[in-house]
Amino acid sequence: MIHPPAQKQAARRYTHSVKIGNLYVGSDHSIKTQSMTTTPTADVDATVAQICALVEARCEIARVTVQGIKEAQACEHIKERLIALGIDVPLVADIHFFPQAAMHVADFVDKVRINPGNFVDKRNMFTGKIYTDKHYADSLLRLEEKFSPLVEKCKRLGKAMRIGVNHGSLSERVMQRYGDTIEGMVVSALEYIEVCEKLGYRDVVFSMKSSNPKVMVAAYRQLAKDLDARGWHYPLHLGVTEAGMGMDGIIKSSVGIGTLLTEGLGDTIRCSLTGCPTQEIPVCESLLKHTTTYLNLPRKNNPFALENSESFVNASKKITKTTPWGSVYGVFIKLNEDHMLNTPVEQLLEQLGIHPENGKKDFTTPDGVVVPKSFIGTSVLKKLEQHFIVFHHHEVPCLYDYNHEIWNQEEVLSSPFVHFHASPPFIHSTRDFFEKKQGEQQPVKLVFSKDLDDECEAAVAIATEFGALLLDGLGEAVILDLPNIPLSTVREIAFGTLQSAGVRLVKTEYISCPGCGRTLFDLPEVTKRIHERTQHLVGLKIAVMGCIVNGPGEMADADFGFVGSKTGMVDLYVKHTCVKAHIPMEQAEDELVLLLKEHGVWKDPE
């Protein structure tokens, strides 16, 4: 085994180079952005046009869905057209359920993506089937027999492969033995790479996707650890599957992808946003921009990494003091002089989530605000105090590093909480602080200040750095100081990050796929309408999936599912069970509401 030079271990996990078309991925190369077309692959003109648009948007790898032989044959013409147009972008075929299509399309594309959950084995259908040790061993032999021809062909042709594990579509065999766990995801990946290793084929990239960033981060961390322990340095493609629409999708993707990038993991990335695929690329670029600081630093082990695949609860934090904001993770927004002087107080309250007519709080109203000391005693402050916990920075101790002597001063010990102002790099310095203070019981508010003007960049920055710490279980509250971002957007980012990290649920969560050539309805429009009708159902998870491939499997965490079954038809799910099939699209949204009522989770909007 040839070990990488010492300097290569600085920021990124060492990975060997994999050639995809005329492009290389691995730790010797820049992190690549990629996306997937939403056009029917058999429509060569439309697919080529969308790939050209993606390349214009600076997408570096383009993927298309290949359901069968017709789509595989179309890939030959797509590749020819791209070459004729001078478009040198690697073309990737996405395969589910149909190994014959993979064998056929490998002649025409640069990389083949397969899903271990459905390439050879059956996807888990929750039948309760029991696999004996002999059945399991026989299944592994069958896996090797069915998978080896594709491996040998890709090796012979110099084509790359992605082994893409999805949390929601583990095979029946793996689910029966390991359950719906991180261990099951890792085993699923390792079973396939062992066949590749046996045949001397190493042009492989891995992905370990989930719609839950917490699961996704834990799975990638565990796979990287297990691969490195074996001396296998395969590149990783990062993504949160079915992240959703708009700001919610950006935040959820950033919590997962951003956390891993700051830890040196990841060689290619994709933000799976519902809508036009070109919109994904600026988010990917923003993620890479905001994690550059960490990639230029010596790589550090995370003392709070989620090592245990059975538990996502970090035990290092044991806070016994009661906080003024209660048992939830607190959200505080810093107000500046412009807010206090130039915004009418009723308008300011509305921007903070207070209904102007009845004074009711929105689901994303912060727990409190931080104000300049000069406004103590003013009429504006008195209005704010009717709705929020209000304080100024000098009322509580402000710490910039952990110092045992300072921590044990009476001023700190007697305070209901302390503020921690992290120095750059925010994640590393905060982890250092909490590692040193383990055992101390004082609640800590993390202070997050960013001088950003762009709302997307602000969302990416906060969701990446604050989200990583939430996944570690650090802190009891956050103060967000984003003076150039509208207060309503600051609230959306704060609570969206908490929700994506699974720390504080304040709204309905939507698991919606980005769409591809398999999509059977107008995914963005239908998702938008369902959101409008159900957004008041706090804590509920609803999946809106374009087809049966990404439907029953990828909505692993959803309570209810709205899944395209055939053209113009929708199936409705409760958890993993289809309860209403082939509903005409024009009736399906009303039927979803009826289903929610039947299960006692519906309430009329206020």
Swiss-Prot record:
Q: Would you tell me the protein name for this molecule?
A: 4-hydroxy-3-methylbut-2-en-1-yl diphosphate synthase (flavodoxin)
Pathway assigned to this chain's UniProt record: Isoprenoid biosynthesis; isopentenyl diphosphate biosynthesis via DXP pathway; isopentenyl diphosphate from 1-deoxy-D-xylulose 5-phosphate: step 5/6
The keyword Ligase is annotated on this UniProt entry: no
Q: Which cofactor does it need?
A: [4Fe-4S] cluster
Relate the protein's function as given in its record: Converts 2C-methyl-D-erythritol 2,4-cyclodiphosphate (ME-2,4cPP) into 1-hydroxy-2-methyl-2-(E)-butenyl 4-diphosphate.
Residues that hold [4Fe-4S] cluster according to the record: 513, 516, 547, 554
Q: What is its EC number?
A: 1.17.7.3
